[in-house]
Structure formats: structure tokens, C-alpha cells
Amino acid sequence: MAKTIVGALAPLVAARARASDGVVIVEETVGRGVEVLAGVDVVKVNYTVALASSKARVDSAKFFVFGVGAGEVVEGFDAIVGGDGATPPMRVGGARKAVVPAALAYGDRGAGCDKTGNACSIPPGEDLEFTVELLEVK
């Protein structure tokens, strides 16, 4: 279950410890456009992902398109955009920052690992920081 926090990213880290079972969201900008319907809508977003432990950016995309709730992205990314009951879905024009726990990202397997599994761009057990801007609901 996501927890919404209004304010800067600094309180997000402290709040993250209290919300260890879920995504912690900072609402940077509340959109005024169409609200996302999880399981129905396809969205276009700009996003960046960084390792929570080092702040090293590991991924980013502009105009990324995916079906919300369709299993196309990690569960935490879906919760940021589509909401989860405790946090409302995003609206077009909105922007959020969030910390996604490893269990709702890549878990114990990590991602971008070499064939030996020793070098991973996202190490196993790593929490991730997302910045997401909702551009369009298709």
C-alpha cells in the first residue's frame, strides 16, 4: 500500500523507513488532466530511476508508453502511476517522486546483471527512487 507525502524528497527517506512494506510517494505536481484507470489505460510518461542507496541513475526514458496494471513494468511503477487504493492515480500533467522497495521492483534477482550474476546495474535487494511525469492517457 502506497503512502503519499507532500513535500521535498528529504522527508521521503525518513518516511520510507516507516512504510517499509510499500511505495512512498511525494506528489510534486498534481495534474489537472485525465485520471489514470489502472487495468484499462495506456499511458505516456517521462521517468528516471536511481538506486536509493547511492542516487546513481540506472534508467530513464522520455515518452515511455505502457499499460498501467498490465504487468509491463515493476509493481511499484504501476502503483506510482495507477495508485493503489491509499494513493490516488496520477492525472495528466502530474509529477511524482517515489521510493519503491526492492520487493516491488526487482527483488532478490536484481536487473541488468552480467552472465555471472555478480555485476548488476540494479543490485539484488536494492530500493529504487523513481521520478515520473504523466504526459498522456491514451
For the regions a language model picked out, list residue spans one by one.
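Cross-family detector of peptidyl-prolyl cis-trans isomerase
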Residues: 3-138
